[in-house]
Regions:
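Small cysteine-rich, disulfide-bonded extracellular modules of the LU/uPAR three-finger superfamily
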Residues: 1-92, 99-139
Length: 139
């Protein structure tokens, strides 16, 4: 499973434009979405969101945990496990974003998690396991 932070997210975190008090969401997309970490900055840049029973456009709210790691000199952000019950969907990736509550062109992208292959639920529970992103590097 590969994860990457969008360049704009790293910039927003360091500038203080995004923090742990913000509202975050996770949306599911198909394998047809090709992320571009350099140019995709807003939710409106994301294509091929999944559709299906038990899934609402825009995804679900998540409450991440931000931890300063003074040993490895980085910020660790953990997004919790999310489930869609009684769902019939096929997803390849999860896209996390800061939600502003208006147009998708205002919502800042955080990171994308590629599952490596399609994950399918057929009238059951789709479970997205917790994901961690680390910003910074060892000294």
């Amino acid at each position: 499973m590969a994860s990457l932070a969008y360049d704009s997210y790293v910039d927003d975190v360091f500038k203080g434009n995004i923090d742990d008090a913000d509202t975050y969401y996770v949306m599911l997309v198909t394998s047809s979405y090709t992320e571009n970490r350099a140019t995709h900055t807003k939710r409106s840049d994301v294509t091929n969101e999944v559709t299906g029973t038990g899934y609402t456009s825009g995804g679900q709210a998540v409450v991440p945990t931000f931890t300063k790691d003074t040993t490895n000199h980085r910020l660790e952000i953990v997004f919790p496990t999310v489930t869609w019950t009684t769902s019939t969907i096929t997803a390849r990736k999860a896209v996390y974003y800061k939600r502003r509550g208006g147009a998708s062109s205002a919502d800042e992208l955080c990171f994308v998690n590629d599952f490596g292959s399609d994950v399918v639920s057929s009238g059951g529970t789709f479970t997205l396991n917790a994901s961690t992103i680390r910003i910074g590097s060892p000294a």
